[in-house]
């Protein structure tokens, strides 16, 4: 265990870190002309479909951890990959991914309200480091999303419970059977890791911890053969 992780065990350190993270997030939003801060309860939002009871409170990925996870990718060149965020909320992770030259970026969000905010943020986003300009917010239930048959990085920040997670992973597994390709799944706060690990076409690549933020990385079987 690193000394940084050990320090985060102390309540005072965690509180100071939380305050610093929130202030840094608001500064980053202001600098990039977007509004991605704030938690949202899906039960208080307009949503598509009937799975609102299976959604988890929206908490945006911190800028720091998001950039760390993207730097930690097992891909030397992302230009041939599509970035997909399932449960993309206000679009923060889409904008962080745009700092890398992905082929394109897709955000899937079932809340009409959050999708509208994400679209607004994509339009107003200003960042001289932006390397991908094809950002596509999609308003739909994740269980209905058809994964594109191309190399992809799929990001999940514990967006929904097992009722939704299972069909999503089953759809991905089926897509990999029909179109074998390199796919990486980054699952932050991997509460339902057993659901992902039950997929026959995915294997555990790494289990990581960044300042107390746990995430698992999975990769399609075809990439390791």
Question: What positions do the PLM features span?
Answer:
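Glycine-rich SAM-binding Motif I of class I
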Residues: 91-95
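Conserved SAM-binding motif I beta-strand of class I
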Residues: 104-109
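C-terminal substrate-binding/active-site "lid" region of AdoMet-derived donor-dependent transferases
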Residues: 163-222
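Active-site segment flanking the S-adenosylmethionine/decSAM binding pocket
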Residues: 137-177
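Residues in the short beta-alpha loop(s) of Rossmann-like NAD(P)-binding domains
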Residues: 111, 121, 191
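S-adenosyl-L-methionine
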Residues: 1-79, 115-149
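Conserved class I S-adenosyl-L-methionine
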Residues: 80-89
């Amino acid at each position: 265990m690193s000394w940084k992780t050990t320090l985060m065990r102390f309540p005072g350190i965690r509180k100071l870190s939380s305050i610093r993270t929130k202030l840094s997030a608001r500064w980053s939003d202001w600098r990039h002309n977007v509004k991605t801060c704030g938690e949202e309860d899906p039960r208080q939002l307009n949503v598509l479909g009937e799975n609102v009871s299976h959604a988890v409170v929206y908490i945006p990925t911190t800028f720091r951890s998001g950039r760390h996870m993207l730097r930690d990718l097992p891909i030397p060149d992302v230009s041939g990959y599509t970035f997909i965020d399932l449960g993309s909320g206000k679009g923060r992770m889409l904008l962080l991914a745009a700092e890398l030259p992905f082929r394109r970026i897709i955000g899937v969000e079932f809340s009409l309200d959050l999708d509208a905010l994400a679209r607004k943020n994509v339009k107003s986003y200003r960042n001289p480091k932006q390397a991908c300009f094809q950002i596509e917010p999609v308003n739909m239930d994740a269980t209905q999303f058809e994964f594109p048959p191309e190399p992809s990085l799929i990001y999940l920040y514990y967006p929904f419970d097992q009722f939704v997670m299972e069909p999503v992973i089953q759809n991905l597994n089926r897509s990999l059977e029909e179109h074998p390709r390199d796919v990486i799944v980054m699952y932050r706060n991997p509460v339902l890791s057993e659901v992902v690990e039950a997929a026959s076409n995915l294997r555990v690549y790494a289990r990581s911890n960044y300042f107390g933020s746990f995430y698992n990385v999975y990769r399609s079987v075809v990439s390791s053969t």
